[in-house]
Amino acid sequence: MSNVSLYQTVKLKKTKTNLRRKGFPWYYLDEIVFDRRTKNIKAGEIVKIQDSNLGKLGVFAFNPNSKIAARLLDVNHEAVIDNNWIRKQLKLALDLRKNLFKESFYRLVHGEVDNLPGVIIDRFGDTVVLQPNSAWADLNKEKITESIMEFGISNIVLNCMSRSRRLEGLNEGLTVIQGAVTEPIKVKMNKAVYFADVLHGQKTGIFFDQRFNHELAAKLSKGKDVLDVFSHVGGFGLAALVSGARKVFAVDSSAPALSLAVKGAEESGVSEKFETINSDAFDAMKEFFQSNRYFDMVVCDPPAFSPSKKTLNTGLRAYERVALHSSRLVKPNGYLVLCSCSHAVDLSKFRNACVRGITRAGRQVQIISWGGAGPDHPINSQLEQFGYLKSIFFRLLS
């Protein structure tokens, strides 16, 4: 079936033609030729894009209200984006995750990388949290929901609270649109049990992206005292305890998140070795330092200090500050794990900020490893923004 009569054709400006290779997932507003017909295209509509030489670049979701005007759906210029097409993309995404994980707790769809631009789906057993973060995703959320239900999902939470939606000019809101979700969901990960509040928690309730970094930190923490700063629901700390850490102190400014961490510790059978501190992270680290309290391992996994390029320098200074205060708490030959989820901060800039902070504290340092998000968060080879997560493992020698 041809889509010739279905989708309007949009052209790129001549000066932009050679700047992109076929398969690049985004085209920006200033790359698009806006003629009378283009100006009438509504947010979320599907278009075909050609370069100035009439080269066919594929089928795209279009939004004239966003800086990212076009998001790739299919490189096949004749693709028809219907329920069958959506179902096919979901199955491809599911097949990858089934090969990776025994338990059904993971990022099921990671936006453009899974050919569903702006769609984020986190799976919690028979429950999913759907984030339609683009105009096309929002316009087609019912079709996406129908397709999800065909894969054994009973409950669907529609989470429309992301920063990305605001950039797309979309409304906010959160509701259960299928089934029932009345309490935090038990999540099994890295031999620990966590509890995710998918209705009131941060983002979708838990951070699946850190799973493999949790695992490495846990291996290094056996028999050790661990300080887990910006702990949220106990991410690094609980993984460490079930792997043999001696004691974990979890610091977070959110009392509800820490209460879920305590519940996870109880369910994991490690509550006697788990202590929470409801405090500002910097205040807590300063207090530990003033009390001469030191740890074999310190982990800091803060929120995004630099969500956009405009906040890059401010964010880098904040990461340097985290590195300074946390490195002062690490015993000689101990470990420091520093993380960033800021899209605007690449690995090199983040590493340099961390090293500046550590050396300001007078510490001699080795980098023993670094990592990103797990394989349920794949990265588009042409879009480095999807490699947002950076976790660097340091050993402090003195």
Region spans (language model):
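Non-catalytic substrate-recognition/targeting regions of SAM-dependent transferases
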Residues: 109-122, 138-206, 215
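C-terminal catalytic and target-recognition region of SAM-dependent MTase-like enzymes
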Residues: 335-398
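Conserved SAM-binding loop of SAM-dependent methyltransferases across substrates and taxa
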Residues: 233-246
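Conserved class I S-adenosyl-L-methionine
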Residues: 223-232
